[in-house]
Amino acid sequence: MTNALLAPWTTAFALPPFDLIRDEDFAPAFEAGLAEARAAIAAIADNPAPATFANTIDALELAEATLDRVAGVFFNIAGSDSTPAREALQRDLAPKLSAFSSEITNNRALFGRIEALWQARDALSLTDEQQRVLMLY
């Protein structure tokens, strides 16, 4: 059976297909989302091309798309309809998500790319929105 969390959502307004999502879908979906995000972030950090807004910041904005989608569904469901199984998964996920966040924060190569953009920001002709997003990184 297909994991509804990892399949494209064809529902109205691209809402999660709640009728197809099962509790046992969450753990593998989180693992897939973490693996995808780690690979995307490694590709950004290890990119030999000079840092640009597109190949660094825009890419970072998309790097965690699957993970964000899975987490959004899970934490909304777990927060509104808690069960022992969902609480157990939250306990299992907490250190994994924390470690992932720390990996990003402590990634020197990634920081170097963001710092290069920050130092060159006045010469980059960024839109107001891009300037704000860069500042947030």
Predicted regions and their residues:
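Zn2+-dependent metallopeptidase catalytic domains
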Residues: M1-Y137
